[in-house]
Structure formats: structure tokens, C-alpha cells
């Protein structure tokens, strides 16, 4: 019965996307990707940092299912490679924080993912945010995660550019390449040369730390060479006018802006993050700063809160 209800809701959302946008899309992920690529779109794309980690183990299938059902647009996930070359979802290089590794293997075995086989990792149970191990939730492979996300939500592969070739092989096999976003800090030339090897590539977005020398240099290289990416992920730690200036330039260039409200250190300092918004009755006291500066993609640690606010102002209706 629950599955039927979820399917009905999914169909209703998809039908709404088609009617409101004036275009027909094969699935919700395709509709989201279209908004991501459209610099004129006023739709604000919501990305979920490691999924719904407040209620389920981070980077897990239940955490992914939860954000899909709440109406999020992008599932952000992290990748690591096992000893036997299986891509799994993990932010950390080892499994100590997120699994019951010590209980299963003791202290004599290396907890690094690169030292563990996939079979060994499957003996572990993932932990909830409160450090309590689940009974059945395992660390998923990238293939399993993408199969869950396929056509339902777009995916941002974080900490994954080094595995580009492996990731692309999986996305091509599953038919989801156009639904996947990968980001990085490599030069324009490096990215262009690497992607030239393939006929079909994932979406790419440069990360620019505008208050750091290398990050600002990367941003300036795009501007000076006249290269207009789909969007920039902009990071900055102090509100001193730097962001406002560069945001105006980005919007004028025909690109989009992605910001991270997960931590204040990434979005202008204290008073600008999701936890600050949580303390305000009017979430616009925090989020409107970004919207007023042309931001149309936000990675959040409180996606339900952000989605509710965006819907209330007509900025999250496909």
C-alpha cells in the first residue's frame, strides 16, 4: 500500500513538472537536469548533503530514498575505492566513524577502505548520526546508489573526479550519465582534455574558493578565457563584498551559482547557514541573501526546511 502511494505521488509530481514548465520530460531527473542547465530558470535546485543523514545513516540507500520522497533535486554522495576495486559510498577514507568496524574486526585490522574488500565491508553495519549501529543497513556501492536514483533524482558525485573513468562506465551502463554532476578544481585545460576522450560526459561544475588564491585564479581563468560553465560552486568564508561582486559577474555571464549552506565557513560566515535558518521563524531571513544574489542551486543539510521555504515563495515548482 505504501509503495502504491509513493508511486502515485511520483506520477503526480512528474505530471506537474510537465504542465508547469510547458515541456514534457521522460522522468523527474530529466526535468531537474533541464533546470540545472537553464541559466534563465528561476527554479532553485536543492542538493542534499550525504542524503537525509539526520534520520538515516549518511550515504545510505534509506538516506537516498528519504530525500527523493521529500522532493529534493540532487543527492550528493562521496566515493571511495575498495581493495578489490569496487566503488562504494563513503565520505571518510576509513570506516570507523560510520560503521561498527571495531566490534566486527577488532583493533588489529586496518579500517581504511582501500585496505578492505567489498565482501569485508558488507560484514559491517552503518551507523546512524547518533553513533548507533543499524541492524541491516550496509554501505552501498555506487552502482546500487545510482540504480536507486535513476530517473528520480539527479546525483552529485563528490570526492569522485579521480574515479571519473570508472564512474562514467557505470553511468553509461545504467543510462544515467545525463543525470550525474561531478565537480572539481582542475584547470579548464585539464578538464577539456580529459572529457575529450569520451563522446558522452557527465555534467561538470568548477569549484571556486573565491577568497583563496588558487580558487580565485581558477575563477578568473574561466572569465579571461570566455569559458562559461553550466554553473560555479562558489565557496567563501567572510562576508566582505567578494561574493556579491563575483555573483553578479557569474549571472551576467550566463552561468549559474551553487552555494553550500551546510557550514557557515563555506557560505559567508556565521549567520548564513542552514542551522541559522532553523532558528528563524522566517527562513527567508537567511536564504533570501543567496536568492537575491542570483543563487539557484543550494546544497543543504536541512533540505526539508529549505524546500518548504522555496515552495512558499514559488521557487521550487517544476
Name the predicted role of every residue range.
Residues 17-318:
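Phosphate-group recognition and catalysis centered on beta-loop-alpha active-site segments
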Residues 4-13:
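Sec-dependent N-terminal signal peptides
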Amino acid at each position: 500500500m505504501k509503495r502504491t502511494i509513493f508511486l502515485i505521488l511520483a506520477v503526480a509530481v512528474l505530471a506537474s513538472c510537465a504542465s508547469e514548465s510547458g515541456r514534457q520530460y521522460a522522468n523527474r531527473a530529466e526535468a531537474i537536469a533541464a533546470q540545472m542547465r537553464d541559466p534563465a530558470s528561476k527554479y532553485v535546485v536543492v542538493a542534499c548533503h550525504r542524503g537525509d543523514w539526520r534520520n538515516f545513516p549518511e550515504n545510505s540507500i534509506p538516506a537516498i530514498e528519504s530525500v527523493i520522497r521529500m522532493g529534493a533535486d540532487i543527492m550528493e554522495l562521496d566515493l571511495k575505492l575498495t581493495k578489490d576495486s569496487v566503488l562504494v559510498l563513503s565520505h571518510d577514507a576509513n570506516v570507523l566513524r560510520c560503521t561498527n568496524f571495531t566490534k566486527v574486526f577488532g583493533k588489529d585490522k586496518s579500517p581504511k577502505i582501500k585496505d578492505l574488500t567489498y565482501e569485508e565491508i558488507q560484514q559491517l553495519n552503518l551507523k546512524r548520526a547518533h553513533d548507533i549501529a543499524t541492524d541491516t543497513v550496509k554501505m552501498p556501492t555506487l552502482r546500487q546508489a545510482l540504480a536507486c536514483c535513476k530517473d528520480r533524482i539527479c546525483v552529485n558525485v563528490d570526492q569522485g573526479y579521480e574515479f571519473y573513468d570508472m564512474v562514467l562506465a557505470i553511468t553509461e551502463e545504467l543510462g544515467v550519465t545525463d543525470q550525474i554532476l561531478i565537480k572539481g578544481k582542475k584547470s579548464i585545460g585539464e578538464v577539456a582534455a580529459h572529457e575529450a576522450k569520451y563522446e558522452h560526459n557527465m555534467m561538470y561544475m568548477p569549484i571556486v574558493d573565491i577568497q583563496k588564491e588558487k580558487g580565485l585564479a581558477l575563477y578568473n581563468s574561466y572569465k579571461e578565457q570566455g569559458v562559461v560553465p553550466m554553473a560555479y560552486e562558489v565557496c567563501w568564508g567572510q562576508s566582505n563584498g567578494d561574493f556579491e561582486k563575483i555573483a553578479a559577474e557569474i549571472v551576467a555571464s550566463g552561468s549559474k551559482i551553487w552555494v553550500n549552506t551546510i557550514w557557515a565557513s563555506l557560505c559567508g560566515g556565521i549567520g548564513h547557514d542552514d542551522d541559522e535558518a532553523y532558528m528563524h521563524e522566517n527562513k527567508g531571513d537567511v536564504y533570501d541573501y543567496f536568492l537575491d544574489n542570483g543563487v539557484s542551486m543550494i546544497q543543504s543539510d536541512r533540505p526539508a526546511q529549505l524546500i518548504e521555504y522555496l515552495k512558499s515563495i514559488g521557487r521550487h515548482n517544476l
